[in-house]
Amino acid sequence: MAADQLAGEGYKTLAVVCDVSDDQQVEEMVNKTVAAFGRLDAAYNNAGVQNELADAADQTRQDFDRVTGVNFRGVWSCMKYELQQMRKQGSGAIVNCSSIGGILGGAQRGTYHGAKHGVIGLTKSAALEYASRGIRINTVCPGLIHTAMAEKMIAGGQKEALDAMLQQVPIGRLGRPEEIASAVLWLCSDAASLVVGHTLVIDGGYSIQ
């Protein structure tokens, strides 16, 4: 576990299990973080799930609620409670994870793409509200990244679809999680102090074609 690894290196850590689609759990997560560290300087809202592949007419309400509950409402809920703390401090930085699915369409992935489009709208609106209060909010849009979600797509029989998408990536490879982490750290740092409401696409050139 990452928290255990960091603790072993001498860092103070706190691991909290949280279902981001549950507002009460999200509030408790933020409260526990503030109790442990005294404040909340930065947050990365990264939880996400894929929808079951289906045409729009065949997508189920259950799957829609599951995906939007995590990918859209989850981001909204996390921001809500993070901002309540940052507002008290008068400072902070939030990065929300959208996806290239947030700037493109995707057949049979309407719920996922719709939720990720929504994340960008949430981010821009909140960024306008809080920029003058010392709080910056931005979005990252990762492309094809070697993550557990990609592994699940392969295991679920979508390897051919993933390979076809990868052939369209000009850089010719999957992204690495640490490449996204570096971008998030930059957006949260003082080096990005003028960056507000921005949508940073990190996809190896996939979306510029």
What are these regions (language model features)?
Residues 39, 131, 136, 195-197:
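Short, small/polar-rich loop/turn modules that mediate ligand/substrate recognition or access, typified
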Residues 79, 115, 123:
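Active-site helix of classical SDR
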Residues 99:
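Residue(s) in the substrate-gating loop at a strand-loop-helix junction
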Residues 17-29, 61, 178-179:
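The beta1-alpha1 cofactor-binding region of Rossmann-like NAD(H)/NADP(H)-dependent oxidoreductases
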